[in-house]
């Protein structure tokens, strides 16, 4: 919360990593919602990107998770990780379609160069 206040005074970019939030842990989701409200209050009108990072091995539970994260924080995009293994991440199609939230990036490894822009055609080819 203090980071957001400081950013309002002197930063061009703020990254807030809320790793470990589980949609079934209400206190953590409430905290996420609070962070979102503070950003709205302290940085009104800012260009804001709120990304939900989803593991490609996530099944149908991913849709429930995405719905609750969208409600709590207004997600604007999805990052689909762990596509370097046998996981295909097909649930992301249902999430993107139902919630009207685009997939922005994919992760295919653990290095910084392994985060790549999402390319729908390549993703669909890999699914079939």
Regions inferred by a protein language model and the residue ranges of each:
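P-loop/Walker A NTP-binding module and the surrounding RecA-like catalytic core of P-loop NTPases
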Residues: 1-128
């Amino acid at each position: 919360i203090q980071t957001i206040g400081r950013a309002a005074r002197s930063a061009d970019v703020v990254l807030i990593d809320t790793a470990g939030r589980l949609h079934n842990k209400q206190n953590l989701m409430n905290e996420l919602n609070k962070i979102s409200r503070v950003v709205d209050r302290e940085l009104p009108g800012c260009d804001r990107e709120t990304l939900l990072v989803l593991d490609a091995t996530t099944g149908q539970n991913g849709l429930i998770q995405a719905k609750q994260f969208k409600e709590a924080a207004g997600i604007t995009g999805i990052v689909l990780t762990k596509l370097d293994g046998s996981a295909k991440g097909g649930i992301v199609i249902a999430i993107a379609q139902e919630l009207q939230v685009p997939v922005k990036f994919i992760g295919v490894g653990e290095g910084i160069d392994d985060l790549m822009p999402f390319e729908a055609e390549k993703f669909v080819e890999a699914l079939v």
